[in-house]
Amino acid sequence: HWYCPLEQYTSFIRAITDYSTGSYCLPGALLGTFLAALVVRGLGLTGNMARLLDCVAPGGALIVVFIRLSALFNSSCRSKIAITTPLLQHLPIGSGITNSMGAVEYRFATFFVQAILMLCVTVLLLYFFFARRRLPMKEGCPRDGNVAWMFLTFHSAVELLMDSTRYDSSFMHFNAFVSIVQIVSAVCILAVLIHYSRLSHKVNGRCGYHVAMWIGYVLTLVGTGASEYLVQRFGNMYPICYTVMTITCPMMAVIVYLMYQTTCA
């Protein structure tokens, strides 16, 4: 967060030591969780960091639910989509905010919808932890760490879609078009897909299934990227662009999950 709105901080040291000003960015919070796990392992409090992250993953998803709900009724939601239909000007679709002129206007309730989606991800991860995690894996494929990988995948898919619907102040200085959250989310999904592709290739050998999965991933990535470009360039293309992204973003996560299944015994 320090990198994005530099004007909020006097220095980097002040940003990481003075918490009375400024804000945070979710990718940084996730990185902090990973670093905390490294510290725990370094102190000898756990011998299996992957299993520790598996235990943390469902709670991490639930934390995002409360973070988004806590920011629902303030200016940090900053949804781009105006809700003009009176029937939709209430939760879960719309929420009222006070603009700079003191008037109330209704915007898409981005954080509320994201909280609902992350609650679904929490339930999915709990099922994955108590049921899927115990399934045997093919020789050479670790059983631990898969819940954390799935959290990274599905949380990133949700962020990739929902962050597009709001004005996010966290963007690269050389490119204000796509937010850092979206960039990190796309990279995370790609990293998890590469991880499971390598495992699957090691235990199953090279096959057409891998090619099909990667073609599907590229198509969904292109669909997501093109929709994001069009929705930023042409404001009146919200309906069609977000309809496409509502399909392609979850499909990216599903493709990762299907690749994971090829490593199960």
Q: For the regions a protein language model found, what residue spans apply to each?
A:
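Hydrophobic, membrane-interfacing alpha helices
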Residues: 1-265
